């Protein structure tokens, strides 16, 4: 197994899941074109398309609610909240 840092390992794991399951979608603030604030999703939108890796509005409560709705409807969402301090507004969901 190749040695890699944490960012590369997360990117590889997400890529693997997107390849093996067409119901996996990734979304969050700047995760699409930009590749996330820490570049964890870099290149995934180019490889899998904007319908599976896409940006969300700056609304953590909305991100959580959308992820729950996707899950209830058979998708396997990976919702990214940029920083731990931003998760608190999502607790209302």
Predicted feature residues:
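Thiamine diphosphate
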Residues: 1-93
């Amino acid at each position: 197994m190749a040695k890699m840092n944490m960012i590369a390992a997360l990117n590889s794991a997400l890529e693997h899941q997107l390849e093996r399951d067409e119901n996996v979608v990734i979304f969050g603030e700047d995760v699409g074109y930009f590749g996330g604030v820490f570049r964890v999703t870099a290149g995934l939108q180019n490889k899998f398309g904007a319908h599976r890796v896409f940006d969300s509005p700056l609304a953590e409560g909305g991100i959580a609610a959308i992820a729950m709705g996707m899950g209830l409807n058979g998708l396997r969402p990976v919702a990214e909240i940029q920083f731990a301090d931003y998760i608190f507004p999502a607790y209302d969901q």
